[in-house]
Amino acid sequence: MSDQQQANQQDDQPFFNIQRVYLKDMSLEQPNSPGIFLESEAPSVEVQVNVGASQLQEGIFEVVVTGTVTTKVQDKVAFLVEAHQAGIFDIRNVPVEQLDPLLGIACPTILYPYLRGNIADVITRAGFQAIHLSEINFQALYEQRLQAAMEEAQGQGGDSGIVMPDGSQARH
């Protein structure tokens, strides 16, 4: 096999690389401090996690995992933390049907430990007991979102599907 053939074969191989992981945005609100520190009742905690992806240029994608933690004591907000943990990923030569799961499962799985650490750190630095977010099965979350989108498409009576990053549609 010539060097040129070998180079061409390598150029066609699927490629995945993490270019950068970074904290894109983070906010902390403590609307009822310092009085909330005197409360003795156990707080209630609500956690929301969302995933978004966008193409920055050919083969370069940004994936953002957003985590929001709202803690209340009775009806008073003790604190609200929102963090956007992002990553830039170089993804080439991946079939379009595999790209969406890669962006919706593999990339968030890489980013989530950073998000967990950043949220726990800011909560502790704010003077509260650390809240350690539990692990998330991004495969199951992705499948739930896919199922919900397909049901919504069926409910609209159209044969529309999921719009993939390249603009094509996945149909079931």
From Swiss-Prot:
NCBIfam families: PRK05751.1-5 (NF004394), secB (TIGR00809)
Similarity comment: family membership: Belongs to the SecB family.
Any Gene Ontology CC annotation: cytoplasm
Any one GO molecular-function label of the UniProt entry: unfolded protein binding
InterPro entries: SecB (IPR003708), SecB-like_sf (IPR035958)
Keywords linked to the UniProt accession: Chaperone, Cytoplasm, Protein transport, Translocation, Transport
Role noted for this protein: One of the proteins required for the normal export of preproteins out of the cell cytoplasm. It is a molecular chaperone that binds to a subset of precursor proteins, maintaining them in a translocation-competent state. It also specifically binds to its receptor SecA.
Main location: cytoplasm
Name of the protein in question: Protein-export protein SecB
Naturally occurring in which organism (per UniProt): Cupriavidus metallidurans (strain ATCC 43123 / DSM 2839 / NBRC 102507 / CH34)
Oligomeric form and interacting partners: Homotetramer, a dimer of dimers. One homotetramer interacts with 1 SecA dimer.
Chain spans, region Disordered: 153-172
UniProt keyword Protein transport, yes or no: yes
TM regions (residue ranges): none
Alphabetized Pfam families for the sequence: SecB
Localization of this protein: Cytoplasm
Gene Ontology terms describing biological process: protein folding; protein tetramerization; protein transport
